[in-house]
Every structure is written in structure tokens, then in C-alpha cells.
Amino acid sequence: MIHSLFLMNGGGAVFLEKHWRSVVSRSVCAYLLEAQLKAGQPENVAPVLATPHHYLVSTHRHGISFVAVIQAEVPPLFVIEFLHRVAETLQDYFGECSEASIKDNVVIVYELLEEMLDNGFPLATESNILKELIKPPTILRSVVNSITGSSNVGDQLPTGQLSNIPWRRVGVKYTNNEAYFDVTEEIDAIIDKSGSTVFAEIQGVIDACIKLTGMPDLTLSFLNPRLLDDVSFHPCVRFKRWESERVLSFIPPVGNFRLMSYHVNSQNLVAIPVYVKHNINFRDDGSTGWFDITIGPKQTMGKVVENILVIIHMPKVVLNMTLTAAQGNFTFDPVTKVLIWDIGKIILPKLPTLKGLINLQSGEAKPEENPTLNIQFRIQQLAVSGLKVNRLDMYGERYKPFKGVKYVTKAGKFQVRT
């Protein structure tokens, strides 16, 4: 299965390595580094690379490349899923998954990797079990361990390992019983010059924070579950109930976890929450051009569009730009030719506008194509797909928990062609 694991930072340097079967030289990561340089961005590299003697399976999370080295063919998705589990476990343990946090807790990281893989095969990947095996770091525990010479390794067998519900331990108790759900939707879209939608889809996730005493059995229902495509669930979800009734029935893990992810690819179900009016043109003699952009809300159900950022890669012949912003701040880098307009939030009735002159390099031909607008935004308390949580029912326990749902819509790869 997995022979070695390497963690690389943004500069391509290996700052952590772990070997299970045989020691593989870190020089094997040079193949991945070369592929990253060719691709421009680490996210654009193919997840599986073949080298003369190994296969490299990698994923990029939190600015870190997680690289698994294997020698025989195995299902790539199996390895990729394990790498994501490693990243999520480090995030859960240390609050962030960064080079600094990993180096500060390097002993715990090695203890976790030792438990998560047994001779290269996944063994314990559930956060609930790992936290019983390896105690999460705290300031007090670190001080006690340094004085007594003890470690974070637990001295008892995890209770969840022996049950048919490995993601939840027995005897869980909370003073305040609460269940919160975050519905986050990311919209990817391409809008053409006329404002028509060329492509649009939604990637959504439902993250849960469950702190309930005992062994509760939860049922989460939706008002319109039929709009969801390509769903994937946490192992706790009873898939047959979803297939027959379109409800989520599950005994939850303790704490934070991703309950499900889903996809909406029907364009008539994807409401575009912003519109853009644009007028970008260049004179035929190639001396100057005119730039005029206005952004406004559309189909936002009265919610405020926040954190709006417009990024435009201008043509190479652009020398500088003389612009005026009715709202927000803008910067133009004459070296990279990147214009960034930070709008913030749209405060009606006035719409944010950016307009002015474009100065081109003398003697150069008129640009053949207009630039594309890359737009980022965020809308609180709105699921752009129309997904709504109906109710949450609890069985098996007698107390009444606090319940809450939060919705967020944000832009993914949102482009407007001019």
C-alpha cells in the first residue's frame, strides 16, 4: 500500500517524512516539484504521477502538498481519501494545518501517523478513536508531559474500536446539549458578454457540530431534497433511509465533522446572485482604451452581498490605468498587469462602479481579446440552490437540545467574459 508520506511546503521543501515499509529517498519528490513548476499552481497538478520506480499520489491542502509514495498499483481514490483524512485530522488536533503547527507538534504528528497506518494500510482514521489513542495537545498537558516525561498516548483501549459505531465513544456527557449545522454552497459559473449563463453549478457541504450527551439518534429532513445530485455522506449516515425517504438518519460523531457534500448541476436551479455591466474597449490605433464596470445584486432574497473582490488580468500591452472607484479600493500592478478591486459589501441603492482610461504601450497593436473578470463574494444566510433544512428530530434521549442552522453562499470559480 503506502510506503512513505512526505509533506512539502509552498517552496517545495520537504519538512516532514514518515516511512512504513522501506525508506524512500525524499529526492522522489523532485518529480512532483517539476510537475508543479510546469502547471504553475500546485492545485493544477495531476493527483497521480508515475516515476521510474514509484507512483506519487498527492493532494494540496492549506498550502501543504501531501505526497504518498506507493510501489504497486492501488485504487488512487483510496490513497487520496487517506491523504485528506490526514489533513483533516491535523486540522482537528491543532486548530490549523500549517507547517508551523505541524513542526510545533511533530511528536504528536508521528504518533498519529503510526496509528492511522499499519504497515502501510489504513487502520484508525476516525477522529473519535484517534483522540482516545492520542490525546490532543493542550498547554497544561504539555507542561505535565515535560515534567513527568509521559506522552500523549492513551493507556486504555478505545471504546469505539469495540463497538459497531466506531465514530462515537460511549459515556459522552455535556452540560449544554447542542446541534448546529452549517450549509455552505460554492457557486462556479461562466457568464458571457451578454450576461447569459454559459455554465453554472453548485458544490455544497453540510458541516455539523454535535455536542449531545449519550447515544442520540438524529433525523435531519429538508424541504426540497430532490434538487441534490452526486451526494456523499459521512459513514454514520444510513444510506438506505436517504434512498427511500430523502432524509439523513444517523448517530453522530462527537464534535465537528462533515455530514455530507452534494452537487447541483442543473443550470435552471442555479440562481446567479450578482450581475455585471461592463464596457471595456480599445481604440483601433492602440493608444488608449475605456474601462467601465458596475456590479449589482440579483436573486439574493434580500440578503447583502459581502466581501466582493474583482480580479482582472489585463492584456500585456496595458501600461497603466487611470480609474475612479465609486466604492471600494483598487490597485493595478504594472508588472503583472493585474487589477484588483476590493469592493466590500454592496450598499443599495448606490451600486459600485469602477471606470476610467486605459493607457497602452506605444507602438503596440490593439489587444485581440478583452480580459475576463474573476469575481469573489460571500452571502450570509442564503443557500443559492434553495436548499432548506426542515427539522431535526432526536430519538433515544429525553433531553431537548439547542438547534441551529446557518447558510452561506460564496463564489468559487466565477468568471464574467467581456
Swiss-Prot record:
Pfam families from the UniProt entry: Adap_comp_sub, Clat_adaptor_s
Record PTM: Regulated by phosphorylation.
Tell me where it mainly resides.
Golgi
Keywords from UniProt, A to Z, are: Cytoplasmic vesicle, Golgi apparatus, Membrane, Phosphoprotein, Protein transport, Transport
Q: Which GO terms describe its cellular component?
A: clathrin adaptor complex; clathrin-coated vesicle membrane; Golgi apparatus
Residues in MHD domain copies: 176-417
A single BP term in Gene Ontology: vesicle-mediated transport
> Which InterPro entries does the annotation name?
Adaptor_comp_med_subunit, AP2_Mu_C_sf, AP_mu_sigma_su, Clathrin_mu, Clathrin_mu_CS, Longin-like_dom_sf, MHD
Subcellular location(s) per record: Golgi apparatus; Cytoplasmic vesicle, Clathrin-coated vesicle membrane
Keyword RNA-binding listed: no
Report membrane topology.
Peripheral membrane protein
Question: How does this protein assemble?
Answer: Adaptor protein complex 1 (AP-1) is a heterotetramer composed of two large adaptins (gamma- and beta'-type subunits), a medium adaptin (mu-type subunit AP47) and a small adaptin (sigma-type subunit AP19).
Q: Which PANTHER family match?
A: AP COMPLEX SUBUNIT MU
Protein family according to the UniProt entry: Belongs to the adaptor complexes medium subunit family.
- What's its job? Component of the adapter complexes which link clathrin to receptors in coated vesicles. Clathrin-associated protein complexes are believed to interact with the cytoplasmic tails of membrane proteins, leading to their selection and concentration. AP47 is a subunit of the plasma membrane adapter.
Q: What is this protein called?
A: AP-1 complex subunit mu
Report the source organism: Diplobatis ommata (Ocellated electric ray)
Query: Where is the organism placed in the taxonomic lineage, from the top?
Result: Eukaryota, Metazoa, Chordata, Craniata, Vertebrata
